[in-house]
Amino acid sequence: MIVEGTAYWASIKEPNTTYEPMYTINLVVDEETAKDFAARGHGIREMEEGPAVVIKRKVNGPNGMVRKAPRLLDQNKNDVDVLIGNGSTVRVQYSEYDWEWKGKAGKGLDLQAVQIVNLVPYKTGDGDELLDGEEF
């Protein structure tokens, strides 16, 4: 399945390792799409930018399995290696799955591929903006 939206906090080529390592993207979608995901049992994260679906892929699977990174494609479906900045428009390919763990159950979204529709370059907070601008 494929959904289009606006990317925030995307970790596609390198996993986010703040907690358990995983590839992830917060995808801000329109209200109708958010309601559809919620009706299918998926959580919706309310962000300042709008409702978001969190789509992720854990790096480590059962029995020592290591999952590969999702594909990252440009508009022409060529593989690319870029960092996706917040506000980029993307199309995300995912699959839905059910999970059970320690007596709990739910639904998840496996991040399979991301196609960049309109890239906003990723910028680090390295302080260069201060050097380029006006004096203090």
Predicted regions: what is each one?
Residues 101-122:
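OB-fold/S1-family single-stranded nucleic acid-binding modules
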